[in-house]
Amino acid sequence: MQKPELLIFANIAAITYEEPKTAKTKFKAIGCTIVEFFDIDNAQAYLLKNNDGIHILSFRGTEVTEPSDILADLKAGKNIEAIGGKIHVGFKGEINKLWPAIEKAVSDINSLYVTGHSLGAAMATIASGRMQSKVLALVTFGSPRVGNKEYVNSLTVKHYRVQNNCDDVTKVPFLLMGFKHHGTHMYMNYYGAFRNLTAWQQIKDMVRSRVKAYTKGQKFLGAYDHMMDNYIAKLGKFGEE
């Protein structure tokens, strides 16, 4: 999947943070209509259909003003998931709030894309695992680690996992806690170009990026890089592949 396609999903993930009235207008501007809005105990998602009749399920990420979102992020224990392995307790709790309604809404849909940012990326990953036969692709931005090795190996969905340079959320929960990442890792460097780097090369690249950012007055690059607007800005640089 190339930057123009990823940018579409990035915009959808960003608009998902909006309330329905505002979201409706913004989704329409990019060729999507709202099929259903899910909102249960501050867990939220939109089921959309674009002008080509393709369905997209998008999950809202962490709202720093919502205590339930923060608590979900902090509950780092693991629970068994049906497809195999164990997943983050807090993320599972959030998707479970919406799952009965989502399962019903997609029951007659044969195929769809799934996306989300931050907590929404984790929820999107778990949801995709529960309906793997329907998912054309999972596209996530700034995703934390969701489950253990067994769980990750149980996921067969095509997953484009986009990381913006020093995004701190992509580094938690920690590897030492038994959590693993899933999917094709799409790492964007400081300039917005995708780079296929080893783990050690990526660490060196991020150190260089933090030094560059600090000289420009950006002291919290890890938080800055996690912002959805900054994913969109870098994905908009089509010429820097």
Where are these regions (language model features)?
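Non-catalytic, mobile gating and regulatory segments of ester bond hydrolases
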Residues: M1-T115, L119-E241
